[in-house]
Swiss-Prot record:
Carbon 2 of the heme B porphyrin ring is defined according to the Fischer nomenclature. Converts heme B (protoheme IX) to heme O by substitution of the vinyl group on carbon 2 of heme B porphyrin ring with a hydroxyethyl farnesyl side group. It is found in: Cell inner membrane. Belongs to the UbiA prenyltransferase family. Protoheme IX farnesyltransferase subfamily. GO terms for molecular function: protoheme IX farnesyltransferase activity. It comes from Thiobacillus denitrificans (strain ATCC 25259 / T1). HAMAP family: CyoE_CtaB. Its EC number is 2.5.1.141. It is a multi-pass membrane protein. This is Protoheme IX farnesyltransferase. Keywords: Cell inner membrane, Cell membrane, Heme biosynthesis, Membrane, Transferase, Transmembrane, Transmembrane helix. It comes from the Bacteria.
């Protein structure tokens, strides 16, 4: 009996964790932490690191859970998401709402009391931008949902910067612009090979409303824009030669994927492009951090 109770508790924990979309949240937290380190010449305080990381992670997880609550009917008709706890009936809407509220409230309280009020307010605005403006208003209404809603997804390094310094610096906005330009080709690559599922769900993603060829062209165009934007930190003196080389190589590879996708489409290639985009962003920010501590003048 005790063994069954333990197994049941473990299963329930897994169900709640599934609401948090931990793989997505991990990239959010990673870019936020990089923002903390880039904001100061040496190291941010350990208090800033642990409290900022935990607080931002909790609020990001709350936003993910709220997204699952709002989109449970959509998730039920998509192969990629139908195994989530809400479509399967493993959790109720009330349980999910309470869970999201506890996570979000705890994260905001931690940020306000241990980090600084600015970070708390920016994180709250990011939550509203994703969970309400993007999920509720933009996603079901316009094929430009990703472009407009990408502003909330681009905020994590700004949150990290604010956590470390208590201010919004123009260099933090460069990090914002990089993720903002990265978001459309990242999500449109996913939407291309999931276009039939999005169509069944009634979501106006770009491949559904404007067609495959149009979307492939815009993936390519945004990879070109992303390369240009990613070089801005070099132009402003924020980053040096090490970052320059890394940004050019990573960006050129992303453009290569975009060009290949534009010329001849396959679901497999779109899937590889999507996966590369995740690796690209993580690697770009890691190289920027390395350049920060081991600068080589351009």
């Amino acid at each position: 009996m005790e063994s069954l109770m333990i197994q049941g508790a473990a299963c329930r924990c897994q169900q709640f964790l599934a609401l948090c979309k931990l793989r997505v949240v991990s990239l959010i937290v990673f870019t936020a932490v990089i923002g903390m380190f880039l904001a100061v010449p040496a190291w941010p305080s350990w208090t800033t690191i642990w409290a900022g990381t935990l607080g931002i992670g909790l609020v990001a997880s709350a936003a993910a859970a709220f997204n699952c609550l709002i989109e449970q009917k959509i998730d039920a008709v998509m192969a990629r998401t139908r195994a989530r706890p809400l479509p399967r009936g493993e959790l109720t809407g009330t349980q999910t709402l309470v869970f999201a509220g506890v996570l979000g409230g705890s994260g905001l309280l931690l940020l306000h009391t241990v980090v600084n009020p600015l970070t708390m307010w920016l994180t709250l605005a990011t939550f509203v931008g994703y969970a309400v403006i993007y999920t509720v208003l933009l996603k079901p209404a316009t094929p430009q949902n990703i472009v407009i809603g990408g502003a909330s997804g681009a905020m994590p390094p700004v949150l990290g910067w604010a956590a470390a310094t208590g201010e919004i610096h123009h260099d933090a906005l460069l990090l914002f612009l990089i993720i903002f330009a990265w978001t459309p080709p990242h999500f449109w690559a996913l939407a291309l090979y999931r276009r039939e599922e999005y169509a069944r769900a009634g979501l106006p993603m770009l491949p559904v409303t404007h067609g495959e060829a149009y979307t492939r062209l815009h993936v390519l165009l945004y990879t070109l824009l992303l390369l240009a934007v990613s070089l801005l930190p070099v132009g402003t003196g924020m980053a040096g030669a090490l970052y320059l080389v890394g940004a050019v190589l990573l960006g050129a590879r992303f453009i290569q994927y975009g060009w290949a996708l534009h010329r001849e489409y396959s679901d497999a290639l779109a899937r590889r492009t999507f996966r590369y985009s995740i690796w690209y962003l993580a690697a770009l920010f890691a190289i920027m951090l390395l350049d920060h501590y081991f600068p080589i003048p351009v």
